[in-house]
Amino acid sequence: MFLKLLDKLGRKKVVLDRGPSHPRFDLAKPWMNRYYLIFRHRPKWFPFNILIHEMLADDHGDGVHNHLFPYITIVIRGGYWETTKKGKFWRRPGYIGFRSANTHHRVDLKPGTRPMTIFIAGPFGLRKGPRSESVSYTHLTLPTMVQV
């Protein structure tokens, strides 16, 4: 009900799995529902924002990415696999993760699930280095996966 209210207030954004500059934008599909609890368009000078993320699909491709800012993520529904340089970990409800802007990761969902998180974005401008790495951590096999 709360999410429906946010939608009616114009606080929901459906994020697609590719942007309009992508050569196959015609194949774009919903990737995440994003609900803004504070700013729909956060000013660069404001130090944080709070959002609810409802994940609809795995992160794109095989590589990993980071964010423009440090962040905190709190899993409030479902769960997901997070792959980092340290391995592949199950993030269950109640999990709280603190990440720097330089932490590369990817998120993969269990089929048929729609995990939800509270996402607290920190200040802009703290990332050093590239946004993504084409490096794939898919070589991590089940024995290296850890449930946290």
Regions found by a protein language model. Give the residues of each.
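A short hydrophobic beta-strand segment most commonly corresponding to one strand
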Residues: T113-K128
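Conserved short histidine dyad/triad with adjacent acidic residue
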Residues: L51-N66
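Conserved small/polar residues in nucleotide/adenosyl-binding loops
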Residues: T138-T144
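A short, N-terminal "cap"/entry segment at the start of jelly-roll beta-barrel domains
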Residues: M1-N49, K85
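Short acidic-glycine-tyrosine-enriched beta hairpin
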Residues: K85-N102
